Amino acid sequence: MNKIISNPPFHIISPLLFRLARKYFISDTFELCVLIVQLDYAKKMCAPPGEKRSRLSATIQYYADVELLSIVSRKNFFPPPEVDTAIVRLRPRRTKHMVDFSSYERTVRILFNMPNKTLRKVIKKYFKDRSPTILEQLVQRKINVRKHVRELSNMEIEIIADLLKEFLD
C-alpha cells in the first residue's frame, strides 16, 4: 500500500495518525495520505511551534509534510455533522532522521505532558537526579532550556530525543 485516501470516523483519527506515522510515513514506498478530519483537528495537525502545538503536531510534522487543502462546510453533508471538516494531505518526509520513531515518540510524549512548562521544568520533573547532566548537555547542544515545550521545533525535539534515548533505556 502506498496511498491512503479516507474519511475515517472522527473518534479514531488520533490513533490512526499515530499508527500511520509509525508504520507508513517511515516507509520508503509510501507516497501520500489524504484524510477528511474535523477542522479544529486539521488546524492542530498543521500548527507551527507556538500556542496550538501538541504531541500530535510534533509527531506528524516530524514524519510528514502536512497541508490543509480545503475546508468543507458541515452544510455539504447530510445529515450535517456538528462541526466543519477539512481535507488534509500528508506526504512523508524523505529526510534522514537522527532517532528512531520509538525514541522520538517517547520524548514527545514526555515533553507534551506539560506543553506550557519550560523544557527545564519538564526535564527536572521526569529525570530528577539526572536532570543537571541532561540540562548541561542540552545547553551544550544549543537548546534553550527556558523555552516552553509547545515552542520547540521538530529539529530541537529531535536533538532532545537523541540525547534522552540513553537516559530512557
Describe every region a protein language model picked out:
Residues E156:
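Short helix-start
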Residues N2-I5, I12-V149, D162-D169:
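Class I S-adenosyl-L-methionine
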